[in-house]
Amino acid sequence: MLMFTEKEFAAFEVAGLDERMAVIRAQIQPIFQELDTYFAEQLAPELGTELFVHIAQHRRRTVYPPENTWSALSPNKRGYKMQPHFQLGIWGDYVFMWLSFIDNPKNEKQIAQAFLENQQLFQALPEDTYVSLDHTVPQITPLPETDLEKALTRFRDVKKGEFEIGRIIPKDSDLWQNPEKARAYMLATYQQLLPLYQLAVAQ
């Protein structure tokens, strides 16, 4: 069973676009493929729909190496950004599992409004849940410290507004010592987010 280790976090210390991408392709992407295939198999019956694995290729980059990399699970075979999707990704200091709304997904105003009207779904999430309002930076906020009303209103009303919610596993977490526990924590994160996902796709 493949799982993230110190080696994968160290990939973001490799200098140069081609050099870092070579490490990402060789070390990180096979982990994404294996874990996401497993998560898709586990989540599909709960959702009643097939999920497809998408792995970021960073093809638009010509000079600067990526500071993070990610994969996505989506019912759309061709792409994922235009609709709610699950992400598994890694920065230099943590791995993230998000329910993600980026790049102006379809019906984002309706999704944001539905979330504003159903905030009890957020209250049901575990305390170690985090929120990201910009997928291009590593700064995230614990859900209990997030002004949810403000964050969701921004997601609804600002063209570049984004919203990602889920959990992380820090680089120094003890979970990495037990790959099966780490994988179970990741899967549980996605399962806890299913009510929000289902509300979003119903819009």
UniProtKB/Swiss-Prot annotation:
Gene3D superfamilies per the UniProt record, alphabetical: Protein of unknown function DUF1054
S-S bonds: none
Positions of transmembrane segments: none
Top-level lineage group: Bacteria
Family assignment from sequence similarity: Belongs to the UPF0637 family.
HAMAP family for this protein: UPF0637 (MF_01851)
Official protein name in the record: UPF0637 protein EF_3078
Species the sequence originates in: Enterococcus faecalis (strain ATCC 700802 / V583)
Source lineage: Bacteria, Bacillati, Bacillota, Bacilli, Lactobacillales
